[in-house]
Curated annotation (Swiss-Prot):
Swiss-Prot/TrEMBL keywords: Ribonucleoprotein, Ribosomal protein, RNA-binding, rRNA-binding
Protein name, UniProt field: Large ribosomal subunit protein bL20
One GO process term, biological-process aspect: ribosomal large subunit assembly
GO cellular component: ribonucleoprotein complex; ribosome
A GO molecular-function annotation: structural constituent of ribosome
Key word rRNA-binding present: yes
Alphabetical list of InterPro entries matching this protein: Ribosomal_bL20, RIBOSOMAL_L20_CS, Ribosomal_protein_bL20_C
């Protein structure tokens, strides 16, 4: 029987994990077992946070809109309700950007909604 040279596929698998672990600190970057654990944890965190990012940005936009709306004499919920009633279709991302970069335009939107 011929001699079996082992390790090609195993080495590829291990190197794949170790490449994903680049930039980790200590043994987490070059010891396979700990690197594997850290990579699995990192991938779990990345998966979770890709979903969380959407929530976080929406919360940020809402708080920015609310702060600007309160400066203009109303609050977030009344502003959004008024926009729906007066059929102004601007999403929260664009509204927050307007509140930040163009306060005069945001003020006009608030006055339109209030009237």
């Amino acid at each position: 029987m011929a001699r079996v040279k082992r390790g090609n596929i195993a080495r590829k698998r291990r190197n794949k994990i170790l490449n994903l672990a680049k930039g980790f600190r200590g043994g987490n970057k070059n010891l396979f077992r700990t690197a594997n654990q850290r990579v699995m944890k990192a991938l779990c965190n990345a998966y979770r946070d890709r979903r969380r990012r959407k929530r976080d940005f929406r919360r940020l936009w809402i708080s920015r809109i609310n702060a600007s709306a309160r400066i203009n004499g109303t609050n977030y919920s009344r502003l959004i309700n008024g926009m729906k009633n007066s059929e102004i279709i601007i999403n929260r991302k664009m509204l927050a950007q307007l509140a930040l970069s163009d306060p005069q335009c945001f003020e006009k939107i608030v006055s339109t909604v209030n009237n």
